[in-house]
Design a protein with these regions (language model features):
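Membrane-interface loop-to-helix entry segments
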Residues: 1-30, 101-104, 108-143, 165-228, ...
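Select transmembrane alpha-helical segments in multipass membrane proteins
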Residues: 40-48, 82-83, 87, 113-126, ...
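Loop-to-transmembrane helix boundary motifs in multi-pass membrane proteins
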Residues: 110-117, 128, 160-165, 376-422
Length: 522
């Protein structure tokens, strides 16, 4: 285990050195938040990939491969590529033209201050909840490792304390280099984290394959189900009428339709209207470099997802030949971390742990930087101190990083407590679903910006509120991904019209009230 600890210590030392080195010569908020718009596109590309692959993906995608034993999840990459092409061609140039630091400044220039404040607040709340929930995943491997090393079978309260300790350790380390170095530290540490992630996953694949007796012949023999190895699914069935076919298609998560409709709109929202992801694209020298980074990242998503899913498939085959090595009650999400701790040799195990830490810290640093930047630009400078000096802005954004870190630790700890006491909960759906309530409406607002028509701030905000209420009225819908696209289209269609009369505004408010009454209570 000393070799593993050595690998992890070297990783942390490298991260801190990069973060401190990157934090030199920062004289303005633009330097801190956008790296003075001077970062190379390939570094931004690596940073996008590192931010996308959270701890939830690192553990959840192999879990999907283990459970489904096919590659249908990967077809969603069709939509992610299309969505990024649209983002690069439609959104990035206006952001550069207006020289925004917070993308919600762009909404103010198009629709007024009220729209900017509304979108900014929605982002802050939803990002704290979503990133805090995802932070929980980073603690899973560390908790399993502690139990493996000590041989202690902890009770529920002890497990929660272990999670909290793990989340605090990861968050404090990430907060230090993020607060000191700003976006430059985030991007350049992400480059290292992307390399560590890639090497660790390829190492896991090599070990898995070498531990399966018989190699490919054994893998083929174990994978003999009707849906095994499948790449594409239309979601249709035999002997069903048109309506039944439609219901069946909409009720499935991974289909070609979900790829073209759901994944495309979701990617447009995540990479075009979310400060968390757009901020690094704005650090490129110009919009063309930012566009190149985001589109190439979409192309690389496909092989990355294939590697994660294939890892899960090999995990299934490995435990088919070694059933005694895996406890029968092991949750799907814990299969990969259990393999890492119990099966990998020294050194490679440390590399995989470093890989998980890389995914967690990459996503966390991105969230902290974007939250602090948005709060500083939209609220501290925008409302409380418009005349703030650059030194005051830098102090605010650094303290904001620490404050948001505490909030994310709090949300992550609550999530850990809830999952430990309710193990049947699918926390990945909760983490992803938080943004499902807001992404479609936010995307609709930004799409309205792409038209020559200038809606009033009141019409945009009222329509945005209506869309949120409509989405909240159907929280258990199985068509969550498609609802995001419907939300965006509805928001775009209605938001392009002005509310000229009191009667029209009254009608929208009445519709809001009826939807609020329809929404189930918590």
């Amino acid at each position: 285990m000393l070799t593993d600890l050595f690998v992890i210590v070297i990783y942390f030392l490298a991260i801190f050195c990069i973060g401190i080195y990157a934090g030199r010569r920062q004289n303005s908020l633009t330097d801190y938040a956008l790296g003075n718009r001077s970062l190379p596109w390939w570094a931004i590309l690596a940073s996008i990939l590192a931010a996308e692959i959270s701890a939830a993906t690192f553990l959840g995608a192999p879990g999907e491969g283990y459970h489904t034993r096919n590659f249908t999840y990967a077809q969603l990459c069709i939509g992610t590529i299309l969505g990024r092409i649209i983002v690069g061609r439609l959104f990035l140039k206006p952001y550069y033209d207006y020289k925004v630091v917070s993308i919600y400044e762009y909404l103010e220039k198009r629709f007024g201050l009220l729209t900017r404040r509304t979108a900014s607040m929605v982002f802050l709340i939803s990002r704290v909840l979503a990133s805090g929930t995802r932070l929980y995943f980073a603690g899973i491997l560390l908790v399993i490792a502690y139990q493996f090393l000590t041989g202690v079978t902890a009770d529920a309260s002890q497990i929660v304390l272990l999670y909290i300790a793990a989340l605090v350790a990861i968050s404090v380390a990430t907060t230090i280099y993020t607060a000191i170095g700003g976006l430059k530290a985030v991007v350049w540490t992400d480059v290292l984290q992307a390399v560590v992630l890639g090497v660790s996953m390829l190492s896991a694949l090599w070990v898995l394959f070498s531990h399966i007796p018989g190699g490919w012949s054994s893998i083929s023999a174990a994978m003999n189900g009707g849906d095994d190895w499948k790449f594409f699914s239309w979601g249709t069935g035999e002997g069903l009428d048109f309506l039944q076919q439609g219901a069946r298609v909409l009720g499935q998560e991974y289909t070609v339709w979900a790829a073209f409709l759901g994944a495309t709109f979701i990617t447009m929202a995540t990479h075009g209207t979310d400060q968390d992801m757009v901020q690094r694209m704005l650090a490129a020298k110009n919009s063309k470099a930012g566009t190149r980074a985001v589109i190439v990242s979409g192309l690389l998503d496909f092989p990355i997802v294939i590697i994660f899913l294939f890892t899960g498939i090999l995990l299934y085959v490995f435990y088919q030949y070694n059933p005694a090595n895996l406890p029968a009650d092991t949750p799907q999400l814990h299969v990969f971390p259990y393999f890492i701790i119990h099966e990998l040799p020294n050194g490679i195990r440390g590399l995989l742990i470093a890989g998980l830490l890389a995914t967690a810290m990459g996503s966390l640093s991105t969230a902290l930087n974007s939250l602090a930047t948005t709060a500083t630009k939209d609220w501290y400078q925008g409302i409380f101190k418009p005349e703030a000096t650059e030194r005051q802005l830098l102090r605010c954004v650094r303290w904001g990083t620490a404050v948001f870190s505490l909030l994310l630790i709090l949300v992550g700890s609550i999530t850990a407590w809830y999952v430990v006491h309710h193990p049947e909960v699918r926390i990945i759906q909760i983490a992803l679903g938080i943004f499902g309530y807001t992404y479609g409406s936010l995307l609709g607002i930004f799409l309205c910006c792409c038209t020559p028509h200038r809606s009033s701030a009141v019409s945009v905000v009222l329509t945005f509120n209506t869309s949120l209420n409509a989405r909240a009225s159907f929280p258990q819908s199985p068509f969550a991904a498609l609802l995001i696209s419907f939300d965006a289209v509805r928001m775009f269609s209605i938001g392009c019209y002005r509310l000229h009369s009191l009667s029209t505004a009254s009608a929208v408010l009445t519709f809001n009230a009826s939807l609020s009454a329809r929404a189930p209570s918590a």
